[in-house]
């Protein structure tokens, strides 16, 4: 990686793509400049073209910042890109990505699934453990000295247990059960109406909406807010906390580090902004792995993406990073 050139980092999720530019400073450090968030990637579409488009968006913003308002020097160039993305699979070739962005003078790219960059963001590359990244969706990554394991991240229809969209889906189900008389009355009925309108019309909106996952996830904050006042909301949040803890424990076990004395577990993402979720997650983790240290993330996903170029070959995560250079 060219240490004299700036590095563009992308955190590409389904609800938004965040970007920053790390500019080298004379003292050997870096200055980070965050760029405006752009629309998220769609897992139903080819990923590489979407990442190329978002890179061009970031490059145009970078060019405008070389004047006002950031006054970045005109001699500053971007030499490499580090990307953590939802939906990244083995058929997403770093070479294809590099071909699509080389017109901007970029000569090196690193690509990884966002479970990898999420892990690096929370625990770095020198500590073993598990990281649960829970926002609209959820994916968990466990890392040991020899193995790494991904858990969940399979989308709102068949996975994402404990994620915001998962909680929103359960909240809608509870509201519809109450509406029909199949379940108890709940304050989540009002939440559903505030987000989607008339209950008897929700299904028409939901099934024709290509942003349904995002809109389901938008209910989660209200669900967690009501956990102390509504029995149904309490049950949903308790289940979510336990599912997230089960994913973390499974990742530790599959990475063969659950018996290690010095392991860490970290939860990151908007779901963990809820005190109810974070406290119950910790409780469930300690019931499964009493010796695990629960720690706050040391960085954010963009800082995790920035580390992709520094992962040593003997780290299990190294094999999950696609790299191309000209």
Q: Where on the chain are the PLM-derived regions?
A:
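Phosphate-binding/catalytic loop of phosphoryl-transfer enzymes
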Residues: 88-186, 322-326
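ATP-binding/phosphotransfer module of carbohydrate and carboxylate kinases, centering on a glycine-rich
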Residues: 1-64, 70-79, 100, 121-130, ...
């Amino acid at each position: 990686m060219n240490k004299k050139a700036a590095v563009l980092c992308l955190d590409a999720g389904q609800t938004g793509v965040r970007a920053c530019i790390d500019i080298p400073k004379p003292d050997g450090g870096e200055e980070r400049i965050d760029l405006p968030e752009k629309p998220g990637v769609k897992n139903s579409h080819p990923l590489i073209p979407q990442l190329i488009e978002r890179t061009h968006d970031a490059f145009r913003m970078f060019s405008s910042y070389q004047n006002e308002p950031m006054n970045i020097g005109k001699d500053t160039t971007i030499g490499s890109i580090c990307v953590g993305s939802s939906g990244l699979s083995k058929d997403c070739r770093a070479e294809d990505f590099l071909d699509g962005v080389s017109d901007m003078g970029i000569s090196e790219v690193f690509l990884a699934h966002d479970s990898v960059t999420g892990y690096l963001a929370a625990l770095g590359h020198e500590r073993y453990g598990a990281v649960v990244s829970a926002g609209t969706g959820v994916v968990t990554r466990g890392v040991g000295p020899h193995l790494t394991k991904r858990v969940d991240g399979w989308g709102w229809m068949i996975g994402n247990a404990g994620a915001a969209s998962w909680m929103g889906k359960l909240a809608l189900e509870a509201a519809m059960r109450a509406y029909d008389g199949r379940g108890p009355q709940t304050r989540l009925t009002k939440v559903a109406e505030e987000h989607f309108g008339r209950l008897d019309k929700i299904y028409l909106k939901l099934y024709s909406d290509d942003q349904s996952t995002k809109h389901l996830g938008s209910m989660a904050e209200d669900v967690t807010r009501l956990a102390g006042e509504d029995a149904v909301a309490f049950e949903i949040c308790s289940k979510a906390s336990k599912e997230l803890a089960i994913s973390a424990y499974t990742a530790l076990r599959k990475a063969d580090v659950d018996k290690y004395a010095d392991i860490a577990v970290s939860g990151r993402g908007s779901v963990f902004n809820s005190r109810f979720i974070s406290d119950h997650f910790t409780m469930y983790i300690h019931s499964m792995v009493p010796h695990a240290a629960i720690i706050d993330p040391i960085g954010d996903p963009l800082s995790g993406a920035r580390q992709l170029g520094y992962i040593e070959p003997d780290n299990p995560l190294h094999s999950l990073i696609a790299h191309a250079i000209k």
